[in-house]
């Protein structure tokens, strides 16, 4: 149960942060955001703000989305002869077009619609008391659809495809960007929780409780200077010296550890502990505990994880295998393991997955943010927009590829994790 809760929390945070990036910069770019949804499937909760954005919480805690005006099948169609009721503002402009028979307003003006333009001219025409009349429609007017859903109209100037190229590019990039920021922030938080960043350039050590070194008398911040005569000046020297000193070590044999404690040099016999095929002496690298060191340490961890993910992506391209990919099932399995290991493991997993999600979404495949960014760049180079039909077909092809890949990855994960 704890694994499921951890999975939902991690996945939910990653999705909210990612989609908020798209949402925020779409608004800043003048694009009307129809809906900001967390989860998929039937609505559990919904709220419409003054800007016309519908915020929804949906039943399945898997994914989420930001729906912008001008994307896909976004146009509201009103059939000729459809009965409607119009609500006018003080200037005589239509501020509400009600097509629902279940939400009637007795103060509104009844009309049978014969024509309309809610994108360019912003007008609606119809029969009012058997007389044809045309009314101007306010830029921020709303439509109550037949099922009772109220949405804002989307004039051309607030549709996605009519925003500036720069606005669209930053809107598409903002999701992955937010994932990178989240990953960096969580890694920095993790370093602070751990007390600092391991200092691999030093030979000062932290001594593990009940470990071999602790039993021999070593204490935190002691300085190991030699192991079996091998000089130690850094953590790498220490690990190599332990490896060399224990290479032919018998079951009950010890090694000599020379260390400096409170300016006094001491040599003790330490009995290494065997773990799998390697020996350890129960010490960790000392920590750099300065505020700046912690900040830089978090950035270093984030860069290290990003570099690892990029190398894995390179390996995936040169030698594709489903076993190198993981979907929601694999993510649940990792969340379950992290939950059992405590808060630091959960935070580490969240940070890694956030950076992973950011990099994955920048792959230039249609339907991913990277594919949209690529089309923005092509449009900027050509200095003319890509036809909407062409863009729609390209996106549809990308969606089909991603759906097939996701099904294959999920099936592979199920077989790997549960069987």
UniProtKB/Swiss-Prot annotation:
Molecular function (Gene Ontology), one example: metal ion binding
EC number from the UniProt entry: 3.4.24.-
Subcellular localization(s) per the UniProt record: Cell membrane
Enzyme class label: hydrolase
InterPro entries xrefs: PDZ, PDZ_sf, Pept_M50_Zn, Peptidase_M50
Organism superkingdom: Bacteria
Chain sites annotated for binding Zn(2+): 18, 22
Transmembrane segment boundaries: 169-191, 301-323, 343-365, 392-411
Pfam families, A to Z: PDZ_2, Peptidase_M50
Span of domain PDZ: 175-274
Keywords: Cell membrane, Hydrolase, Membrane, Metal-binding, Metalloprotease, Protease, Transmembrane, Transmembrane helix, Zinc
Keyword Cell division: no
Membrane topology of the entry: Multi-pass membrane protein
GO CC annotation terms, alphabetical: plasma membrane
Cofactors: Zn(2+)
Principal place of residence: membrane
GO biological process: proteolysis
Active-site residues (renumbered): 19
Family: Belongs to the peptidase M50B family.
Name of this chain's protein: Putative zinc metalloprotease SPy_1963/M5005_Spy1674
Species annotation: Streptococcus pyogenes serotype M1
Lineage: Bacteria, Bacillati, Bacillota, Bacilli, Lactobacillales
């Amino acid at each position: 149960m704890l694994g499921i809760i951890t999975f939902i929390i991690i996945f939910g945070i990653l999705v909210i942060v990612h989609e908020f990036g798209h949402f925020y910069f779409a608004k800043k770019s003048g694009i009307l955001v129809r809906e900001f949804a967390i989860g998929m499937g039937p609505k559990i909760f919904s709220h419409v703000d003054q800007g016309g954005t519908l915020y929804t919480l949906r039943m399945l805690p898997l994914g989420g989305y930001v729906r912008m005006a001008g994307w896909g099948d976004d146009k509201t169609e009103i059939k000729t002869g459809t009965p409607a009721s119009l609500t006018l503002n003080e200037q005589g402009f239509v501020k509400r077009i009600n097509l629902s028979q279940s939400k009637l307003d007795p103060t509104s003006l009844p009309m049978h619609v014969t024509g309309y333009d809610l994108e360019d001219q912003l007008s609606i025409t119809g029969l009012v008391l058997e007389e044809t009349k045309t009314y101007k429609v306010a830029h921020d007017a709303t439509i109550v659809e037949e099922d009772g859903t109220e949405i804002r109209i989307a004039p051309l100037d607030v549709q996605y495809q009519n925003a500036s190229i720069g606005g669209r590019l930053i809107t598409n990039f903002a999701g992955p960007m937010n994932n990178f920021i989240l990953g960096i922030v969580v890694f920095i938080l993790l370093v602070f929780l751990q007390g600092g960043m391991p200092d691999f350039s030093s030979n000062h050590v932290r001594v593990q409780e009940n470990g071999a070194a602790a039993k021999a008398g070593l204490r935190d911040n002691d300085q190991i200077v030699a192991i079996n005569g091998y000089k130690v000046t850094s953590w790498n020297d220490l690990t190599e010296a332990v490896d060399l000193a224990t290479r032919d070590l018998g079951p009950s044999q010890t090694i000599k550890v020379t260390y400096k404690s409170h300016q006094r040099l001491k040599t003790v016999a330490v009995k290494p502990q065997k773990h799998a095929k390697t020996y350890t002496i129960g010490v960790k690298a000392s920590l750099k505990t300065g505020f700046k060191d912690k900040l830089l340490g978090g950035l270093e961890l984030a860069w290290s994880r990003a570099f690892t993910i990029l190398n894995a992506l390179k390996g995936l391209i040169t030698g594709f295998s489903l076993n190198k990919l993981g979907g929601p099932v694999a993510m649940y399995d990792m969340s379950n393991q992290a939950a059992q290991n405590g808060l630091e493991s959960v935070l580490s997993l969240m940070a890694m997955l956030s950076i992973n999600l950011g990099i994955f979404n920048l792959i230039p495949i249609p339907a991913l943010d990277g594919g949209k960014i690529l089309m923005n760049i092509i449009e900027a180079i050509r200095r003319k927009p890509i036809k909407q039909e062409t863009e729609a077909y390209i996106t549809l092809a990308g969606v089909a590829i991603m759906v097939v890949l996701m099904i294959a990855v999920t099936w592979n994960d199920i077989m790997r994790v549960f069987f």
